[in-house]
Amino acid sequence: MKDSIKAKLQSLIERHEEVSALLSEAGIISDQNKFRDLSKEYSHLEPIVKAFKEYTQALEDKQAAYEMLNEKDAELVEMAKEELKLANEAIEKLESELQIFLLPRDPNDDANVFLEIRAGTGGDEASIFSGDLFKMYSKYAEQRGWKIEVISASEGEHGGYKEIISRIYGDGVYSQLKFESGAHRVQRVPATESQGRIHTSACTVAVMPEADEVEGIDINPADIKVDTFRASGAGGQHVNKTDSAIRITHIPTGVVVECQDQRSQHKNRAAAMSMLKSKLLQAEIDKQQKEQSDTRKSLVGSGDRSERIRTYNYPQGRVTDHRINLTLYKLDEVMEGSLDSIIQPLILEHQADLLATMSDE
């Protein structure tokens, strides 16, 4: 392991001890925000410290085993060889883990998200598939213990949605869903197809981290135009009686957001403002990623909504993620929310990309 990496790890261990001491101070305990932030930092540092201690122990075990090789007893020498092998394997594994821990951390990884699914080419079939995607993400969220709420929905004429926007909140939502942005293509025989022909249609998915005050997304009230209108569709009878739905236009950028699924105009406005901040934050993230891609090409993290990232082929029961050439023949499981078999390889690919960048620097 490089001395620079060891030095960085040592500084993190010292910070872990410092944070641990701070968390027991009365002034910190009484300040909810500081206590929450330090608790989050402590939980982030804890596995790093644990892995580094195991790494240090493995180095000591290796040295002890190496010294045992000089013993005259043949049985002890064989034991030393086995212990040396195990120590080397542990060192290699822990070095990889520690390098990943040191990768630049996405500041939005802990954020909740807005999930936007829009029907693209394919007419009614695209709307139906957008409904299927929403169910898939809803089931995945349920499996991970997250909560999901619909912010706005425009239903398709024959089922599904022309567009549906939801908020997903829980632990580490953005870290798991951020690579889902892009064009999702489906190949299947529609229920209305009498000739049994396979149709291709597509939906676009956008995953945006929910912006809060710490993101520094400030909106000048003079830069927005707020309209109220009568809600329609999901939301029940109550919303049809009042002009409770909200549409906010951000004049400088032309970004428009709507919210109609909350029970009051006040709640709809708050949800719409939160979504507007997230869209402006996402625009800034997209800009930064574009600047980075000018110097290096990332297979996974471009987040370009127009980029075709995945194909769902129903006749073959196949799902293919085109960014990492991953093909799985378990479409039914994926559509039931078993997404980790796709998401985790994407995360590993992204980490490998970052590690390669670190090696080049």
From Swiss-Prot:
Record flagged with keyword Aminoacyl-tRNA synthetase: no
InterPro entries: PCRF, Pep_chain_release_fac_I, Pep_chain_release_fac_I_sf, Prokaryotic/Mito_RF, RF-1
GO cellular component: cytoplasm
Pfam family, one: RF-1
Region (Disordered): 286-313
Gene Ontology MF terms: translation release factor activity, codon specific
Biased composition (Basic and acidic residues): 286-297
PANTHER family in UniProt: LD18447P
Role, per record: Peptide chain release factor 1 directs the termination of translation in response to the peptide chain termination codons UAG and UAA.
Similarity section: Belongs to the prokaryotic/mitochondrial release factor family.
Name this protein carries in UniProt: Peptide chain release factor 1
Organism of origin: Francisella tularensis subsp. mediasiatica (strain FSC147)
Organism lineage: Bacteria, Pseudomonadati, Pseudomonadota, Gammaproteobacteria, Thiotrichales
